[in-house]
């Protein structure tokens, strides 16, 4: 197995990514989750988190590590993933990124976008800090969150000081990391999984039915009872957000909610495949028919 290789295994929701991992040999690789909802504690069933059995077979990172009220974005993912890659390489273990968030895969391999957009709320917040606490406070804050940037700009360059803090508060990543060049990961084995769309539709219907059988309704009631609502970042996931309609319209039939989850899931699959098809140098497989070829590619 080639040293310093990184493996991507991606594909749409319900394609069967987790099933392949049960066939991995123990102790050689660890999985880094590339999903924006499985990161949250308590949101278990509709997010289709890897099972206890799978996580005992192969270690998973970036699962169940955030509170539901915390924001998760590309910046947090990139920062955490970069640390995990280094740690696994130090242990001579293979990093295997598995999930369906194409945007995260793209920027992990090709680097972060050159300075990301910042919301008007963040700009207002930084401006209020400048107005109420002054330039010296902003300088100390920049020194704390991005010492490299702090050392590289003039203490009188208030525009760049403010911009640097805006980017950090928006993404959780120092602007100095965005400005660096040559961060592309070269040695990536990108494996894509796909099935015919009718097969995907059937699998989604089955998966949503299994969610209900496994207690999704009870999980939703428990989450709402704890005060989580439409402002909770974790509730943006498919399978959760649809039940917010049920909360606001209790006369809605459960079957209508289930149908909406199936519809939204299938539309999401189509969007995922549109994005994945644009990623170059991907080796595409059917997860059932080509399992042996996939394992040979990864571990030989």
Curated annotation (Swiss-Prot):
Residue ranges annotated as coiled coil are none
EC supergroup of this enzyme: transferase
This protein's UniProt keywords: ATP-binding, Magnesium, Nucleotide-binding, Transferase, tRNA processing
Q: Which Gene3D superfamilies match?
A: 1.10.20.140, P-loop containing nucleotide triphosphate hydrolases
Q: Which catalytic reaction applies to this protein?
A: adenosine(37) in tRNA + dimethylallyl diphosphate = N(6)-dimethylallyladenosine(37) in tRNA + diphosphate
Secreted is among the record's keywords: no
EC number per UniProt: 2.5.1.75
The GO molecular function terms of this record are: ATP binding; tRNA dimethylallyltransferase activity
What the protein does comes down to: Catalyzes the transfer of a dimethylallyl group onto the adenine at position 37 in tRNAs that read codons beginning with uridine, leading to the formation of N6-(dimethylallyl)adenosine (i(6)A).
- Write out the similarity annotation: Belongs to the IPP transferase family.
The name on file for this protein is tRNA dimethylallyltransferase
